[in-house]
Amino acid sequence: MKRKYPNLCSPLKIGNVTLRNRMVSAPMAFPDITAEGHVTKEAAAFYELRARGGAAAVTLSECVVHIKTGMSHSRHINLQDEGVLAGLTEAARSIKRHGALANVELSHGGKYAGVDLAKKAGGPAPVRYGPSPETLPNGSKIEEMPKALIREIVEAFGKGAALVKRAGFDMVFVHGGHGWLIHQFFSPASNRRMDEYGCDTVENRARLALEIVDSIRAAVGPGFPIEFRMSGEEHIPGGYTIEDAIRFAKLLGPKIDLLHVSTGAFENSFAITHPSMFAERGCHVHLAAAIKKHVKVPVACIGALNEPEQMEEIIASGKADVVEMARALLADPFLPRKVMLGQDDDIVRCIRCYTCLAERTHTQTRICSINPIIGREYESRFALPPSEPKKVLVAGGGPAGMIAAVTAAQRGHRVTLCEKSAELGGALKCVKVISFKKDLYGLVKNLEAQMRKAGVEIRLNTEVTQERVEREAPDVLVLALGAAPIVPSIPGTDSPKAVLGTGLSEPEVAIGKKVVILGGGLVGCESAVHLAQQGKEVTLVEMMEDIAVEANVRQRPILLDMLAELHVKVKTRTKGVRITDQGLVCTDDSGNETFFEADTVVVSVGQRALREAVKGLLDAAPEVVQVGDCVKPQKVTEALYRGYHAGLDI
């Protein structure tokens, strides 16, 4: 058949293997590793899902080659323990049986290795080593790595590569970027040595990387592909530039089979290496394109890639030979398969909310805001089919209701979804005009398409009442009635100057030049960014001590940076008391009044669950399930998870 994206779907030979297309699953750590650093069946299932989804290669992440000095967290796979062989072998097999190449990342944390985590290696707590002695901002003392230890680590990379080849992996991935050990040696900001590994020349700073690659090549033999990740730029004072990276790449090129160009260092803002929703798609591709002009080895790019049209252009124009994706393949593990089949309208696009990365930090688990399967890949295989099809009525067309309807219909039930308004989307309707939320609003259209494909009957402008339920006589009633915006009990909320935060997407709502937002929660802060990007003068007023407190640990610092960058004025511990024709009157902790002039006051102080509507329907059907904001106002993550499992439980 004629492919819609012929370049993206074309094979590529690297070393003695062939990628079946140009879309590769980049390293993503799965936390379900044993305390001894062994791969579990749950972890193998995590990687297998991407192989089933059509990725050309799937990279198992963060295998540490030197346990005493290299661990940066507690969930590394320990390649110095042959006990990991069985788990690695099963992981490789689970990837390869679906036609993907099994790849594995070899890493060492260098000065950012966690000494407390490495204590389990036995003996006294080891010292942290880097290229040069220094004191980190947190007070940690770093010692210069002695040459004997350098030789030991170089040898460990080779031994680790030999072990994973024995386990059946098709290729290896050397992590030489993002501020880890190899990067530290190449960086003039951290390498101040005066020996042959020292800072005086690019060749000396690259020596460790080249010796590691040579050690791996000696261990795995000719033809076995070596992929090497480097950062195209560091983005830190005194760090290396793209010109230095090009020289580094020219030294590496003849020794490797695929050069993976990322960006950033450990010291950067998290958003540099992991692009946020505020970044352009493909924001790092220019670095790969610049390096590719100077090397003969195939080059892979990465960085907020999930649009097939853009990825096709990258390959067709010669900017890169391979596109790699991480979070995009959490949101939709079947993205490559959908591209191959020309079904790109069905792709669920990553919203770059950082939930996956924040949850790993917070609870050491893996979830995805918009894909309830993530973290449950293994157990999801054993979902029992329903004993008999049931008649299901879903009341509410927000995300929780839609995914409940899709899931139930895909399991064979007869499903009708009724939405009171003229449009699906629920709480997500308010984000459709926000440029950095377009992928989140796209989820509404995707769920609608999934419902139609699954045979869900969709009725708009249809309220679910007791009488309607009696007429329909469903076996199961799913209540997804949503929430309503809270309107504070202050004078002026009915003024033409006042706009509810949920109303920003309405075409008839005009927003003036000077805007005051009452409410500094996540929605209020994101509204402030949106309006400031449109050139509005924005002041954000919050009665509590901090703003955006419900944002996750990865998202919040970046959101605060955006507010500062856009010159949004933030006033905390400030309470709005009345809206006037001129703006918003507030009081501080001492009761002193402050006035903020505004053409428009956006009221964004939260949502209230529609509990009264729920109570009237609790006994309307034999089985009644509640999901989404009508239970309590919640993030899209919780709404989708509850809705998905409600559909699964029927």
What are these regions (language model features)?
Residues M1-A395, P399, I403-V415, I511:
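Flavin-dependent oxidoreductase catalytic cores
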Residues L305, G398-A400, E423, P485, ...:
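Residue-level detector of alpha-helix initiation sites
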Residues D332, R337-K338, S527-V541, A639-I650:
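Internal hydrophobic alpha-helix adjacent to the cofactor/substrate pocket in enzyme cavities
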Residues G397-Q410, G512-K536:
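Rossmann-like NAD(P)H-binding beta-loop-alpha module
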Residues H413-A427, K536-I547:
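Glycine-rich FAD pyrophosphate-binding loop
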Residues Y441-V487, T493-K513, Q533-G616:
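A Rossmann-like FAD-binding core segment of flavoenzymes
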